[in-house]
Amino acid sequence: KLADKVDKSAPFLDFKHVSLTYQGAGAPTLQDMNFTVNRGDTVGIIGGTGSGKTSLVNLIPGFYPATEGEILLEGRDIRTMSDEELRGRIGVVPQKAVLFKGTIRSNLQWGKPDATEEEMWKALELAQASEVVDGKPGKLDATVAQNGKNFSGGQRQRLTIARALVRNPEILILDDSASALDYATDAKLRAAIRTLEDKTTTFIVSQRASTIRHADKIIVLDDGEIAGMGNHDELLKDCTVYQEIYYSQYPEQRGGVR
């Protein structure tokens, strides 16, 4: 049983000196990722294009094996878990929102085949997508065209997030998944996700400092290495890379009130 193998004293997730080199690549994509995450934390991951943000979160569900080091989930090396066991605990929302031809209901069932209507509506509400579905003829049974072409980019992203949330995952990974949302919807989505924090550990990859500034821990990546780690205020004080990102987005706040 899984419960027998869980180390209650261990951090929920523990990256121990993890490096990743893709097959055929000369240089490592990630080098010496070393950090712990508590259950229920929200972790923001920020950095420039090509800094390794997506590669880092793709290690958690085991999409790629670490080249060096180990990743422990409640004290267990994730390499000792089957894909089904590991990925059954994780909801991933990739950068590109993907919807399948069918209905809204059938798309949500990809996340959880036996989901009840109540669970579906709860997930839609958290993902700020309930109004979208409510406004469609047939509601949950409304048609979804191939690739969700009959929905806007922001609507597709919200429905994809709902599909990840319907399974009530222990770990939720949002990989730049709110980039097509306006700031108000993005803020509402983040507030809703914070209500899950008791049991859901959330990783948010974003180019926007505003999206991750309230995270419990922010990991700043630069060229595959950790350039800084801490909360928003700590990083704004001590991390040059974070300062550059933040002030490039909020130039009026340089030297002023944050």
What would you call each of these model-derived segments?
Residues 4-258:
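ABC-type nucleotide-binding domain
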